[in-house]
Amino acid sequence: LAKIKDILIIVNKGQLEQYKKILPNGKKLGIKITYIEQETPKGLPDAFILGEKFIGKSNISLILGDNFFYGQFLSTKLLECINLKKGAKVLLHRVSKPEKYGVAKVKKNKITLIKEKPKKFFSDLAITGLYFFDNKVVKFAKQLKPSKRKELEITDLLNKYKKRNELTADYIGRGGAWLDTGS
């Protein structure tokens, strides 16, 4: 797992014991798994607020639980997260139906526009469920205001980095695969 030995899994209220049965503590895998139970769904950025103590001064990778990644690229990308100097990086993948995903427009590896499920086409680069952040992510997540859905939105968090010109793009390379089981 690309030198990653500490993993935080955030679970919905009432699901903690089910997860612990499947992945008790990670000892057999040579990792340490920490669990936090989220009382109510408050959006993806809430994971950083809940995990503040776990994150500390480290960079962090967020992998959505309903996304499946396959290929050797994953270890390489996770290593890059460890070495991320500043900012955030989003893993993108070309899709045939961008209206089903969060989508990004990119210029010279910098993300210039992000929209969630756009009605009008502007890019076919879907934002996969793999994100990399420096340790400012907790501070930025705490600054967010809930959306109309009464949740903190990942696009708002990414836009904080974009405004600082610190949001970059990366791609699933040849031989890699991504499946969003939630879409």
Can you annotate each of these PLM segments?
Residues 35, 51, 66, 104, ...:
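Residue-level signal for inorganic ion chemistry
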Residues 90-92, 103, 130-132:
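Conserved hydrophobic/aromatic beta-strand scaffold that supports enzyme active sites
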Residues 71-99:
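Conserved donor-nucleotide/metal-binding helix-loop-beta segment in metal-dependent transferases, i.e.
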Residues 24-30, 105-106, 160-163:
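Short, conserved catalytic or adaptor-binding loops enriched in Gly and charged residues
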Residues 61, 75, 79-82, 110-182:
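Catalytic-core segments of class I nucleotidyltransferases/pyrophosphorylases
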Residues 1-64, 68-76:
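Conserved N-terminal catalytic core of the sugar/cofactor nucleotidyltransferase
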Residues 41-44, 97-99, 120-121, 177-179:
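A short acidic, often aromatic-flanked loop/helix-cap motif at beta-alpha or helix-coil junctions
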Residues 36-38, 91, 170-172:
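Conserved beta-strand termini and adjacent loop/short-helix elements that scaffold enzyme active sites
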